[in-house]
Amino acid sequence: DPYVTLAFAAVETTRIGLGPLIETPMMRNPAVMASSIATVDSLAPGRTLLGYGVGDTAVRLMGKRPTRVAELEEATKLTRRLLAGEEVEVNAARPAVLRHARPVPVWIAAVGPRTLRMAGRGADGVFIRVGRHEANIRVAIEAVHQGALEADRDPADIRIGLILHTILTDDLDRAALISRSMAAGYYEYSPMLFDPPGFTWNGPDIEELKKDVWPDFHHAADLEASGRKVSFLSDDIANAFSLFGTPEMIAEQLYQVLSFGHKIHMVIPHPMPTPNPSSPGPDFIERVPLEVIPKLKEL
């Protein structure tokens, strides 16, 4: 359970931000999530956030469907009101009220234009998950701002974060294969992301390729093998959807992203593949602050 881990982290730390990156109403009731994150915030005041998303692989593997945009919007509204200490009508005998309410910001992780606009209408912050190509980042931020204007909100009030799949390795051949699998994973669920940069999928139908990849190109057990399935993808396409390579290379790529001119409040370097808990280390969570961030500060 993420909230057990977050509670331990809250007690043992004093500065880092804490929170689930992508919760989904398909897996937990929004009122339960509001209560859980408020409890964590009581242990780490002002250091928490609650991240929402439609859910994809996680809910599909549970036999459920991703959350619809309208459902996510309603869950976001309910959660924010509960965290603000308001009474909320929930079709029960009495309105619901969170008696230990805390002012925890609610973020939404989004890829598609409808979800991005919805996040702009109702979230405190938006985690944009579209890779690192400037055209995709720009289009995504424009969609968030459009949603904010639809709700008579100031776009500047909405914080922007980036989720960037990050392949930290000195083995550049391995990095090249995994980065291709990452690009295919974006095309698998969000093919519209190939349009702003002017990319073309020039290989077999993705549905045919998926028959040999489980559960998908982002979460395959062997990301090098899944990358070989899409070796036809160009370097430009592979480079557009992840940070990859040595600490020096990743620092340079991240510096480029932060130099596009957009105001970015937070970057989440999402490790790919997921680190093995039995690894002797140093692992991703140690290498990024010790090896990547110092290089970034030098640029």
Where would I find each of the regions flagged by the language model?
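N-terminal beta1-alpha1-beta2 module of alpha/beta enzyme domains
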Residues: D1-L21, V104
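Acidic (Asp/Glu)-rich catalytic clusters
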Residues: L6-R15, I37-T48, G120-R121, E150-P155, ...
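Conserved, mostly hydrophobic/aromatic
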Residues: A9, V40, T79, A119, ...
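Hydrophobic faces of well-ordered beta-strands that scaffold small-molecule active sites
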Residues: G17-L21, T48-Y52, V106-A110, V126-I128, ...
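Glycine-rich anion/phosphate-binding loops
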Residues: M26-T39, F244-M249
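Short, acidic/polar
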Residues: S36, A110-M118, P247-V257
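An alpha-helical appendage that flanks or caps ligand/catalytic pockets
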Residues: R65-V97, I137-F260, L299
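Long, low-complexity C-terminal extensions of enzymes
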Residues: N239, T246-E298
